[in-house]
Structures are given as structure tokens and as C-alpha cells.
Amino acid sequence: MKHDLETLKHIIDSSNRITFFTGAGVSVASGVPDFRSMGGLFDEISKDGLSPEYLLSRDYLEDDPEGFINFCHKRLLFVDTMPNIVHDWIAKLERNQQSLGVITQNIDGLHSDAGSQHVDELHGTLNRFYCNACHKSYMKSDVIDRTLKHCDNCGGAIRPDIVLYGEMLDQPTIIRALNKIEDADTLVVLGSSLVVQPAAGLISNFKGDNLIIINKDRTPYDNDATLVIHDDMVSVVKSLMTE
């Protein structure tokens, strides 16, 4: 492990066009449940009596707008979550002009909360909401502080600005993410299994010098990586910062 940390530090220190690609493992330490792992959010959602895929779908929003927004308030707001050391480390490297930014599969908004400016949120963010009818925009604070569920303009359901099942990923976001990967000299994957498509398929477009994967479990890209560390992200970053 010590040798891996030394290698990681050397690569990071010698790179000036780092792109980060993050998944659920990065935010677990902030109290955000992993969606798909055992005991994760999907397991919790299943207790509500409907499938997680349906509850997080465009169909459910259209079939039962009231049920959908009640579900969002109960399961998705993550009111007390704060960025952890991994989010802070990524933001610091961007401030130091070593990083092109971060591409994330997460919807928690914690990269932006940590100060990262160049964030491509592939699946949207819970920091923004909008009316499903008239599209008036709301911030997360509006929804939480006022327990706001219906638009004060037209009465429509206020939904989070996330990609639901049955909806397409935002194409401008995909293009920006692809450019970040293609322009990077080092691509650092943190806390992602790299199996959720089409987002994970973006990794195959990396042509730079170093692919680094830090994840508890193996990924389909491990054999292509310069460095693979199967460990907890927080532990790795803490150790890296004391090297």
C-alpha cells in the first residue's frame, strides 16, 4: 500500500491536466447511501413497496406527481450531508490549476459544495429543482426551508433536476465530460464500479498517460489502468495528504 501511495502521489504531482471521474463510493463517508450496494438506497427504497426503478422514473412522476414529490422529500434530500476530505482534495487540485475538473455520477451536489467549479453531473443534481409543468427554477434551500412541494407560480410538482429512469442524459453535459476525458493527461476514477452505462463508457475515450482507479471492488477497467488501489477513498486521500 505504501508503494501504491508513493506512486499515486508522484503521478498527481507530475500531472497538470487531471480529470476526476467519481461515483457513489466518494460520498458514502458524507452519509449519502450507495444506490446499488447491499443495504444501500435501493434496498431502503424497496421497503416503500414499489420498485426503486419505478419510484425514480419519469413514469412515476407522471402517474402520481404527489407520490413522487413525497418520495423525493422522504428519501432524496440528504439535508445534513457535507463534503468530505475527498471532495475537498479534488476541489483543491482544481484551485491549484492541476485539474480540468470533475465528472460525477453522483446527484448529491457535494463537489460543488466543496468548491469545485468545473463539475459535470452526468445524472443531474439535487442542488437544483424545477417545476415539472412551467419549469420555474428553485434551489434546494427553497425546497427544504419552505418544505416546498408545489410551484408557487402554477401549482405544478417541483421535481429535482436529476435524470430519472426513462429520461435521456443531458447531451451538452456528456460532450463536456468527453472533452475533459480526452484532454486529460491523468484520469482518476474514484468510487465507481464503472458498470453503469452510458456514463461509464466514457472512460474508454481516455488516451492520456495515466489511468488511476481507486475503488473498493474490481472494475472492468482495472487491467487497463496504470495504478489500481482497492481501498476506501477517504483512507487513501488521508494517507496521501500525509505523505
From Swiss-Prot:
Q: Which InterPro entries match?
A: DHS-like_NAD/FAD-binding_dom, NAD-dep_sirtuin_deacylases, Sirtuin, Sirtuin_cat_small_dom_sf, Sirtuin_class_U, Ssirtuin_cat_dom
* A GO MF label: NAD+ binding
Quickly give the catalysed reaction: N(6)-acetyl-L-lysyl-[protein] + NAD(+) + H2O = 2''-O-acetyl-ADP-D-ribose + nicotinamide + L-lysyl-[protein]
What are the binding positions for NAD(+) in this chain? A24, F35, R36, Q105, I107, D108, H123, S192, S193, N215, D232
Where does the Deacetylase sirtuin-type domain start and stop, copy by copy? 1-243
The record's keywords, sorted A to Z, are: Cytoplasm, Metal-binding, NAD, Transferase, Zinc
**Active site location:** H123
Write down the EC number. 2.3.1.286
Q: Which GO terms describe its cellular component?
A: cytoplasm
Location comes to: Cytoplasm
Question: According to its UniProt record, which cofactors does this protein need?
Answer: Zn(2+)
Sites where the protein binds nicotinamide:
F35, I107, D108
Listed Pfam families: SIR2 (PF02146)
Q: How is the cofactor bound?
A: Binds 1 zinc ion per subunit.
Its primary localisation, in coarse terms, equals: cytoplasm
Residue ranges annotated as coiled coil are none
Q: Which residues bind Zn(2+)?
A: C131, C134, C151, C154
Keyword Ribosomal protein (UniProt): no
Q: Which family does it belong to?
A: Belongs to the sirtuin family. Class U subfamily.
The record describes the protein's role as: NAD-dependent protein deacetylase which modulates the activities of several enzymes which are inactive in their acetylated form.
Q: What is this protein called?
A: NAD-dependent protein deacetylase
Q: Give the species this sequence originates from.
A: Staphylococcus aureus (strain MRSA252)
Classification from the root reads: Bacteria, Bacillati, Bacillota, Bacilli, Bacillales
